Each structure stands twice: as C-alpha cells, then as structure tokens.
Amino acid sequence: MANETVIQMIDVTKRFGDFVANDKVNLELKKGEIHALLGENGAGKSTLMNILSGLLEPSEGEVHVKGKLENIDSPSKAANLGIGMVHQHFMLVDAFTVTENIILGNEVTKGINLDLKTAKKKILELSERYGLSVEPDALIRDISVGQQQRVEILKTLYRGADILIFDEPTAVLTPAEITELMQIMKNLIKEGKSIILITHKLDEIRAVADRITVIRRGKSIDTVELGDKTNQELAELMVGRSVSFITEKAAAQPKDVVLEIKDLNIKESRGSLKVKGLSLDVRAGEIVGVAGIDGNGQTELVKAITGLTKVDSGSIKLHNKDITNQRPRKITEQSVGHVPEDRHRDGLVLEMTVAENIALQTYYKPPMSKYGFLDYNKINSHARELMEEFDVRGAGEWVSASSLSGGNQQKAIIAREIDRNPDLLIVSQPTRGLDVGAIEYIHKRLIQARDEGKAVLVISFELDEILNVSDRIAVIHDGQIQGIVSPETTTKQELGILMVGGNINE
C-alpha cells in the first residue's frame, strides 16, 4: 500500500539530565518514500534516529512500527523489526574484509566454520540488485570512504532491513560519490524500501526527498511536501531566521606575502610523489581557496605546511622565514592556525571536555596556566564565551567533545583557531557537516579574518563554498596547481574541467 505508515513517532522526548535533546517530536514515515529529517547542528535529529534504531530509549513518547506499538530497547530489536541505520561515522573494522564486516554479528556457519562462500554470494546478489558495487575480499582500510559507506548500507540490507536511516550520509563524500549515493537511494525505493534521510543540505533534499520534517532546537516544527517550500523557506524554518546563501564581501586588499610555497615535492609512504613541484602564495588580507578532487595532494600539502608530514624538496616560508620540516608546535607558535580535515583524528581529543579542547593550543600559557598550574576557572569561562560567540550547542563546556554533534564539534575547532588570532589561518573542509545557518556564520568569520589582515588558505571539496569565500582559487590536480583563477570570472563547470586536468583556455 502506497500510503501505508511504516514508522510513527508520537511526542517523543529524550532528556540527558537537565538537557532536553528531543521535546515531544512527531515523525511519520510512509512506505516507499524518502523522508528528509532537516535541522541545524544540535537540533536533535541524530538523537531521534538513535531512539528509532535502538541505541537510545526515549524518556517519553511512543514509537509505532508498521502499525504496532514497539519498545525498541536495542539495535538487535530494531534489526528484527526491519530497521537499519547507516551511521555518519562508519562502524567498520579496518583490518577486516568487506565480507567479514557485513556479516559481523550475523555470521553464517557450516559446521563449526564460517561459511564465507554463502555470505559472499548473498553480498554479491545484494550488491547487484541495489547498484552497490563492492569487492567482497578487499580490506576496509584499502577502500575509499564512498566504498566504505556502501559496506555500511549492505550491512543493513544483509540483515533484512526495509526501513533505512541515513545519518548525514554525504558529510565525508566527494561530489561524484554523492551523486552515486543519490542513485543508490532511488534504487532502494524502487525495490520497496523506505528511507529516513538526516541532513541539512537542501540541494540533496531536492534531489531525492518526497517529504520533509523540520526539527529546530529539539522540537518538530513542520512536515511539508517537497514542492511546497523554496530552499530559502526551508532554511528559515530550520534556523528560525532569515538566511543568506551568498556571503557579501568587499574586494580584497592583499598586502605582503605571508605564506610562500616553492617547488614543493612530497612523497607518499610507497615512494611515489603525491605533491609535485607545487608553488603557491597567500597574502595578508586575502582568501585563497584550493579546489580539487579528494586525493590529489591537498591533504599532504596542508600537513606539510603545518609540520605534520615531511617535505622531500622545495620550501615553505612564513613571513619570508623558512619553516620547512619544522615541528608542528614550533609552526603553530609562529602564528599559524589550523582547522584540520578530520576533526576526530586531528582536531579534537573526544574524551576531553569541550573547554579542554578549546584550550589545547594555549593551556601552557597565561592566562590558562599560572606558575605551571592549569587555571580551570579561566579555561572554563573562556570556553563558555567562545561557545556563546560561535553558537556551539551542548549541555555546557564541561561535557566531553564526543557528546557534541559533528557540526558543533567543527564550530568548537574553528572557534579555538580563530580566537588565537593567527597571521595565517589554514582551514580544511571548513563547513563539512554544518547547517546553512552555521555555514553562513563561518563564511562571515573567514571573511572577517581576511578583512583584519590575515592570510587565509581554504581547502574544500564544496565548489559553491570555494566560489563564495575565495579571492583567488588554486585548482589542484595530481599534486600540481592546474591553474589559478578568479571566482568572479570562473564557473563551477570550468573548475570541474581544471580539477580533472583539463584546460579552460583551449
């Protein structure tokens, strides 16, 4: 039945102590639809879906599955009800193969041995049916992020899920992988599945969703048909105010060169060159955006500038002083700020509090420490100020960084680095995982940093972002700068040509 309701969440409330993450939220999913759950960072989307998938239990409210009231008290209970969740941060074992990860906890045996042959056969059948091409014998650590996500989807299908929850599924994907994922979702719907898509990316909602439920600060605001609202109206429902998609900025007034990179060569672990004779400069008072397909040397370039990887030849100068192959802290102390690409691995210590993370670069200096002792009153009060200024939402500065949503973790890192007032600010994927309101704010802060005379280097896979904030755009391909162009005179299509090694002047 086309209009059959498969999920009904009624007045669902979830409290963590005094903090209310979900406040009487209502959500209905119909069979065969893609229902987008739209909300800004920390709105309570993931909490609500963790309740539906059995990771959390509600404080109040009801959950009905296929017309029956259910107590979903564990992921296994959710799986038995046909509910599967594809998490934003993949739950895979790097040292295991694709097959071993998919069958983990649901192993097929033949006598006392694993029946991998039967498992592989089923995986290949599912893979072909839904357009989820994978190599069953490949190790997880050897496949791309997009491939790893396919493994997560296959895990849910292998367990018989017909209701799939996608939690911010495009946060770590390249544009090409995003397009592939949208098609995979459509394939799943054709095969009778139903999908809840947690996101704050309006273009992706336009591409696949049928209906949208908007959540703001833990409350369900409205459920609308896709065609009933413009992107502007959806953004305003999501954040509760008017939002601008294009950041206004005056023409840059670049001054002296702050960062100068000349003939840079960097080898990867297997000995081949990852960065090849790359030269680039960034001046005070400008934003240089680096555009390129993931894996073309951007990560190695940033690691070299920040002292996290060895340069084989060439030079990196800061204010005309050579900093090539210096230690990371020494580079940081020369007024370099760095927002890393991977916030979990390189940006935060998840077990530490938000306040401790904000103080990571300054804890050993006054006023954060005195006579060799940490001043926790100062550390906590400073964190509270920054959390308010940058709208980092959570129960308080004393909670662990792991308890924040992905977007709020990113805002905490950006707050820490901008607060240090660096001469050079390097920002990798500045708005990955952020909602439209937060994106608008971060873009304004980057432009403000530029206007205050800072040199800003932005690395992003989001071409709209690169075009929006940059004064010059350097396109990287195969470890080399393919071209440096102006955002005013270059289209996304032309950037795409440069990103694959083409020439736009032919």
From Swiss-Prot:
The complex is composed of two ATP-binding proteins (NupA), two transmembrane proteins (NupB and NupC) and a solute-binding protein (BmpA). It comes from Lactococcus lactis subsp. cremoris (strain MG1363). ATP binds at residues 39-46. SUPFAM superfamilies: P-loop containing nucleoside triphosphate hydrolases (SSF52540). Gene3D superfamilies: P-loop containing nucleotide triphosphate hydrolases. Induction: Constitutively expressed. The keyword Nucleotidyltransferase does not apply. It is found in: Cell membrane. PANTHER family: CARBOHYDRATE TRANSPORT ATP-BINDING PROTEIN MG119-RELATED, GUANOSINE IMPORT ATP-BINDING PROTEIN NUPO. GO terms for molecular function: ATP binding; ATP hydrolysis activity. This is Nucleoside import ATP-binding protein NupA. Its EC number is 7.6.2.-. It comes from the Bacteria. Disruption phenotype: Mutant is unable to grow on inosine as a sole purine source. Mutant shows slower uptake of uridine. The double mutant uriP-nupA is impaired in uridine transport. GO terms for cellular component: plasma membrane. It is a peripheral membrane protein. Residues 7-242, 259-503 form the ABC transporter domain. Keywords: ATP-binding, Cell membrane, Membrane, Nucleotide-binding, Repeat, Translocase, Transport. Part of an ABC transporter complex involved in the uptake of all common nucleosides. Responsible for energy coupling to the transport system. The keyword Signal does not apply. Belongs to the ABC transporter superfamily.
